[in-house]
Amino acid sequence: MLSDDNGSIHSKSITAPTVLPTITSAETNYLAFGILSTDYHIELYGYLQNKTGKLTVKSCDDYIIAQSKFFNPTLHTKEFSFMNPRGKTTNYRTLPTYIRNLIDHPNSDRNYTQEELKCSIELLIELCRLLPCN
């Protein structure tokens, strides 16, 4: 990585381990510069779903809660409900799912802070690191 220090260009290595199986600009920006992005959040959430086989949002939400070694209810709980067009209500409980759903289905009545995005990304990183690399 190159950095500009008052007009002097320096190179430095990124020593943080990557989480995702392929290099993405979102992950590189997070590891190198600490840049939070919805892209990285979605990449992590999708990777977690695929690697755990929890392909529905609800099953992934339940999986996240069950990871009690990393899931801290005080930090990571964000309860909300969603009613589908047929009138069925689904209740979700985790911050990562809350943010995932707002990214996927923007809603002007709800939002999240940069602190919540950071907290959610950090949890998703920990959960993804638990997964086998095959």
Annotate each language-model stretch with its function.
Residues 1-74:
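C-terminal lobe/lid and adjacent interdomain/linker elements of RecA-like ASCE P-loop ATPase modules
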Residues 80-134:
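Charge-enriched, short contiguous segments at helix-coil
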